[in-house]
């Protein structure tokens, strides 16, 4: 019974971490407008970031993937 309780608590905190903390941490919104994610390739590339999503008609980049660092290595 104790093991089941600890497992449920661990799953609960994992769900919070994955669905609440990570998405808000991972996105940088640019000033570029978009209708699809394809329109965000160039604005995100200018900031040395790969495309992430088109959210609310604004390009949103993913800051952990840095194109410039990968090209320099």
Curated annotation (Swiss-Prot):
This is Potassium channel toxin alpha-KTx 27.4. One of its GO terms (molecular function) is ion channel inhibitor activity. Contains 4 disulfide bonds. Its main location: secreted. Expressed by the venom gland. Belongs to the short scorpion toxin superfamily. Potassium channel inhibitor family. Alpha-KTx 27 subfamily. The keyword Signal applies. Pfam families: Toxin_2 (PF00451). It comes from the Eukaryota.
């Amino acid at each position: 019974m104790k093991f089941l309780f600890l497992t449920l608590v661990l799953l609960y905190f994992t769900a919070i971490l994955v669905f609440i903390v990570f998405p808000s941490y991972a996105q940088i919104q640019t000033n570029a407008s978009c209708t699809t994610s394809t329109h965000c390739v160039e604005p995100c590339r200018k900031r040395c970031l790969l495309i992430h999503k088109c959210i609310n008609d604004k390009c949103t980049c993913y800051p952990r993937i840095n194109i410039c660092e990968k090209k320099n290595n």
